[in-house]
Amino acid sequence: MSIFKGSAVALITPFTQDGVNFDELKKLLEWHIKNKTDAIVICGTTGEASTMSLNERKETIKYTVETVNKRIPVIAGTGSNNTKSSVEMSIWAEKIGVDGVLVITPYYNKTTQKGLIEHFKSINDNINIPIILYNVPGRTGLNILPETLYAMRDLKNICAIKEASGNISQIAKIKALCRDRFDIYSGNDDQIVPILSLGGSGVISVLANIIPQTVHDMCFSYFQGKTTDALNLQLDTLSLTNSLFIETNPIPIKTAMNLLNFNAGPLRLPLCSMDEKNLNTLKTDLKGYGLIK
């Protein structure tokens, strides 16, 4: 039940001062389809879902599904630290036509590994579309252990994991335990090729917001056996990637997009404008990559 192979953009949400800029969202979606993005992830971390109202999230997901119109998969962020809310949002997302859901581990209240299994099972048992688990312990304080993922192998709708732990050894252990049962997507743009080398299926990418073709090419060069080409793309984009995470994501990527004349709009508090020194570093890397003058 694989959803996509290659590069899914973790899409920013373009805002106006008081809402979502749907005109700009449409332009971004069309641009990504034209520039080889393989799937759209909407209302995730990079999309600032945590500072959007429920109605805004629903309107944005529905608009994305309607605009993309099955040309590439649309994956909606539907998770929270409340199991009932996660289930309800996932049921709603399936009804309006998303191709899959991205479900983060519960945060703040955290739970145990047993609680994780029960949380994800509740979502699995209430929908019939693919589920990607999202493991990002640096944000949630909770790590999905390889053994825990293996214990969920019989939950038929759980098809993949977005691995943003940064722990290559853990990802190798996932592959060793689970083999081909789950797709593994890199959640870190500086680890795309390393995770592909462990049998990964692609990336859910922040970097693809500004260079989608390159991230797609990195993945498909690897899939086609052109591993040196893929590695060179990984290394060539490393400095730019580092700049995009010099402050909390999505502060730098949204700043970069505004510098590139996308109408990404403002960040929502508590996210704020970049420190001047970090902004200059970002500008230097954007210039170095030929994206701005």
From Swiss-Prot:
Pfam families for this protein: DHDPS
Q: Name one GO biological process term.
A: diaminopimelate biosynthetic process
Q: Which domain of life is it from?
A: Bacteria
Marked site: Part of a proton relay during catalysis: 45, 108
- Described function: Catalyzes the condensation of (S)-aspartate-beta-semialdehyde [(S)-ASA] and pyruvate to 4-hydroxy-tetrahydrodipicolinate (HTPA).
Q: Which family does it belong to?
A: Belongs to the DapA family.
Identify this protein by name: 4-hydroxy-tetrahydrodipicolinate synthase 1
**Organism encoding this protein:** Clostridium acetobutylicum (strain ATCC 824 / DSM 792 / JCM 1419 / IAM 19013 / LMG 5710 / NBRC 13948 / NRRL B-527 / VKM B-1787 / 2291 / W)
Q: Which lineage?
A: Bacteria, Bacillati, Bacillota, Clostridia, Eubacteriales
